[in-house]
């Protein structure tokens, strides 16, 4: 008998911006998911990411997205905030219908070199992998959910703070964003520990 593998992919978006949250997602895909549709979220157009976001949410076995806000990033640093977001995303996995995921996980793959402090059952393989967001389907899916969720939140912040034009740069350290900050000062969602 062939055992099914339940692989949970975890990735984050938003480690480098000067403003806004760091966002992590965790995803468990079914074995029949059309993986050829996936790619590293950074290589996909925004339109394609949004289409895939809905598909992943509908077809996944379980998924979760978590934001850690700028003030917590300043308090515990970006690495610890990223790991906390990943931990919380894993611990809050839910089915597409919104029920808490109580099923099994046979392997957890985290993009990068640091593994969050997760409470997992014995026998669960836990690995980190650099560039997993370009090679591992469940991590690719997590990358897409994290990026789309964070981008949508930054667009909402642009409505609260239109002068910062977050809808254009999503808080990343672009020339435009740096010029705005130098001209009018930091926004209420600025990461104070990041240099402009």
Regions found by a protein language model. Give the residues of each.
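RNase H-like, Mg2+-dependent phosphodiesterase core
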Residues: 1-196
């Amino acid at each position: 008998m062939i055992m099914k593998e339940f692989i949970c992919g975890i990735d984050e978006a938003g480690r480098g911006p000067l403003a806004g949250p760091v966002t992590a997602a965790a995803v468990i895909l079914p074995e029949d998911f059309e993986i050829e549709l996936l790619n590293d979220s950074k290589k996909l157009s925004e339109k394609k990411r949004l289409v895939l976001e809905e598909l992943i949410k509908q077809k996944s076995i379980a998924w979760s997205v978590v934001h850690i806000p700028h003030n917590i990033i300043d308090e515990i640093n970006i690495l610890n905030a990223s790991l906390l977001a990943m931990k919380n995303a894993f611990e809050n996995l839910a089915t597409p219908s919104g029920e808490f995921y109580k099923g099994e996980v046979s392997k957890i793959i985290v993009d990068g070199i640091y593994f969050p402090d997760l409470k997992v059952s014995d026998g669960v393989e836990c690995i980190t992998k650099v560039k997993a967001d370009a090679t591992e389907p469940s991590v690719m899916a997590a990358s897409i959910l994290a990026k789309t969720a964070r981008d949508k939140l930054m667009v909402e912040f642009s409505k609260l703070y239109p002068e910062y034009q977050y809808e254009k740069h999503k808080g990343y350290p672009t020339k435009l964003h740096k010029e705005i900050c130098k001209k009018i000062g930091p926004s209420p969602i600025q990461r104070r520990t990041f240099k402009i």
